[in-house]
Amino acid sequence: MAGMPRSRNVPPPPSSRALAPVHRRIVECTRCPRLRTYCRTIAREKRAAFRDEIYWGRPVPGFGDPRARVLVVGLAPAAHGANRTARNFTGDGAGGSGDFLMAAMHAAGFANQPTSRAPGDGLELIDAFIAAAVRCAPPANKPTSQEIANCHPHLVAELAALPRVGVIVALGRVAFDACWRLAAGRGVAPRPKPRFGHGLAYRSDAFPAVIAAYHPSRQNTNTGKLTPGMLREVFEKVRGMI
C-alpha cells in the first residue's frame, strides 16, 4: 500500500564464518554515545525523500568478497546513505560517492556493476572488500579522535578475518592514518609516517601495501579535486599490484 513503510534495511550477510562474529560485534557496538545518538536521531527524523523507509540507524559492518586481496577503507557511513541502507557507499544518489567509487572499481574489474544505489541492487565486489575507519555516521562527517580510536578495533578484526588482503586503498586522510595504526599494531609501522598524497603507494614485506586516494565525497568530486579518471588510475594501479 502506498505510504506504508518498507522493511528495515539490513547489512549484507557476513560473507564468511570468520567475518560473522566480527560483524555482530560491530552492529552491537555502543562505544561512542554521541554517534549512536546521532544515528538514531537521523533514522527517526529521516530525509523527506526517504520518509517511507526504515533506516538502519546502527553501526555498519564492511561487505564484499571474503577472499579479497584488496581492502578499501573509507571514512564513515553517510547519514542518509549507509546509515539508511546499511551498506557502505550505498544510497547517496546518482553521482554520489558510491557511484563514483563503484565506477572506478568496476572499470578495474573489482565490481560487477558501476553503481551502488540500494540493498539488493545486484552489486557484487570481486576480489575486494569495503570497510570504514568509523562505523557510525558522524555529525558533519567529522568523528572525534577518540571516536576514531574507539572504532579502530573493528577494522583490526575485519582485516584479520581477510587473510588474503595484499593491498589496502585508503580513501582520505582519516582512512590513511587508520591504515598506519593497523601496521603499528603489527609492529611494522614505518618511521617517519608516510605522507598522504593521491595515488602514492607504500609497500612493505610484513604488511599489505597501502595506496592513498582522495575520498570520493561530493566536496572533492564536485570541485574537481578528484576526477573519475584519477580514481580509475588508482584502481588500475591496484590491479597491477596484486
Task: Give short role names for the model-derived ranges.
Residues 1-10:
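Short Lys/Arg-rich cationic patches that frequently serve as NLS/NoLS or arginine-rich RNA/DNA-binding motifs
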Residues 6, 14-242:
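A polyanion-binding, active-site-adjacent surface
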